């Protein structure tokens, strides 16, 4: 598969290839740059060296050089206008990239325009340079990855007091764990959807190395919680009502799951049924 790259503006649903020979332009260079590093450094007062507590990345510069030439289906002087939809700094277009190797993932990063030049050059051509800043420096796999852990069902036997016709609840079901695996370069902090019925739910990773614990609050059947382990938020159902106080903070160790290895995810709860489950979702994160 040849390299592919394109811009997409969600606000206008406009997609534009970075290279389109039939239209009359080619991307001669796409530089994804490297994120700035947010230095947290202090000089040691009475000795050589520094105290370096640097951990995080800043934004990422992205540049692309595009050359327009005569003879395509679009007049050469109209081609710079094809890119202006992505150069409004109030817009947040997406840059999509697929590299040329077997199994290459589609990567996406949200960018913001920072500069645009398009000088007229002799012989007849236009050499454009588009510059962007990516506030979030991580290239994300476009495919949403998921894993599910089932709490299992514990109810079994006859229902009493006896009524006719006799009814039997579903038999017990063993818990089923899920597996989280990222092929990216950076750790995963998944988004969790916890489906009831469940009381005092607990989601464990790697045999309790990391734990997201809830208080004794009850998630009713048909309800769910959305827990973002990266931003540390918790909302109920789709209305966005915050239930952050349902997090048992004293027993929670937020997951930061290293890439390239399997991580187990399991769920326990009081009085679960066959539909009690936790679904984890994430996008693999890449530096380059």
Where on the chain are the PLM-derived regions?
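Polar/acidic, low-complexity leader/linker segments enriched in S/T/G and N/D
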Residues: 1-43
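Short amphipathic beta-strand starts and helix->beta connectors
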Residues: 44-51, 115-116, 176
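Oligomerization/assembly interface segments of phage tail-like spikes and tubes
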Residues: 47-75, 124-137, 262-263
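Solvent-exposed loop and beta-edge segments used for protein-protein assembly and interaction
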Residues: 56-60, 87-89, 122-126, 182-188, ...
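Long, hydrophobic/aromatic-enriched structural stretches that serve as scaffold segments
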Residues: 60-110
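Charged, amphipathic alpha-helical segments and their flanking helix caps
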Residues: 76-91, 142-159
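Short beta-strand and beta-hairpin "edge-sheet" elements
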Residues: 92-141
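Intrinsically disordered, low-complexity segments enriched in serine, threonine, and glycine
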Residues: 145-288
């Amino acid at each position: 598969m040849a390299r592919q790259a394109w811009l997409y503006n969600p606000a206008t649903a406009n997609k534009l290839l970075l290279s389109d020979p039939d239209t009359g332009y080619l991307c001669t260079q796409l530089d994804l740059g490297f994120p700035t590093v947010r230095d947290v450094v202090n000089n040691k007062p009475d000795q050589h060296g520094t105290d370096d507590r640097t951990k995080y990345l800043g934004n990422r510069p992205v540049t692309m050089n595009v050359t327009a030439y005569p003879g395509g289906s679009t007049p050469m002087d109209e081609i710079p206008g094809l890119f202006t939809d992505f150069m409004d700094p109030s817009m947040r277009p997406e840059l999509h990239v697929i590299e040329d190797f077997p199994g290459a993932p589609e990567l996406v990063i949200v960018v913001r325009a920072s500069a645009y030049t398009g000088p007229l050059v002799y012989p007849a051509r236009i050499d454009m340079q588009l510059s962007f800043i990516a506030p979030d420096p991580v290239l994300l796999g476009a495919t949403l990855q998921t894993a599910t852990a089932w709490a299992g069902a514990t109810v079994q036997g006859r229902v009493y007091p006896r009524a006719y016709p006799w009814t039997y609840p579903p038999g017990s079901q063993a818990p089923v764990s899920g597996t989280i695996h990222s092929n990216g370069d950076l750790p995963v902090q998944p988004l969790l959807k916890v489906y009831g019925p469940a009381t005092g739910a607990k989601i464990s990773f790697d045999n309790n190395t990391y734990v997201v614990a809830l208080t004794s609050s009850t998630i009713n059947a048909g309800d769910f919680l959305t827990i973002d382990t990266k931003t540390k938020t918790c909302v109920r159902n789709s209305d966005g009502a915050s239930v952050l106080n349902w997090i048992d903070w004293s027993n929670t160790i937020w997951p930061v799951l290293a890439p390239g290895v399997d991580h187990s995810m399991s769920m326990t709860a009081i009085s679960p049924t066959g539909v009690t489950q936790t679904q984890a979702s994430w996008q693999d994160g890449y530096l380059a």
